[in-house]
């Protein structure tokens, strides 16, 4: 082994705002924040799950177009699409794309795509 996983860093225009969005979405605690960086940790884990860093002149990904590629996205496992969708939209997400039996695509407030996923019954 060369090393161990530390965290995923996401570029954005406002780290605090995006950290609040993902904190509510994932039930994680915001443990570090200042003007240029914010970090989330999941309950019971001392390591950051996600970190957000301010980028000047941030250009959000364009999904599904690849004019500005998404480069990565987060999958969030859920139990009920309708309940989860209402919650993420209330947090400031935007629906992006059509529904599938196993996933739905949204954009976070900074424009990064993420999916709500539910295994088929």
Which stretches of residues belong to each language-model region?
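A short, acidic/glycine-rich surface segment
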Residues: 57-63
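N-terminal beta-strand motif that seeds the catalytic metal site of vicinal oxygen chelate
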Residues: 1-19, 71-76, 117-121
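Short secondary-structure boundary/capping segments
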Residues: 41-42, 63-66
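Mid-chain, well-packed structural core segment of small domains
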Residues: 66-88
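Core segments of cupin and vicinal oxygen chelate
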Residues: 2, 9-54, 83-105
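Short, acidic, Ser/Thr-enriched surface-loop or helix-capping motifs
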Residues: 108
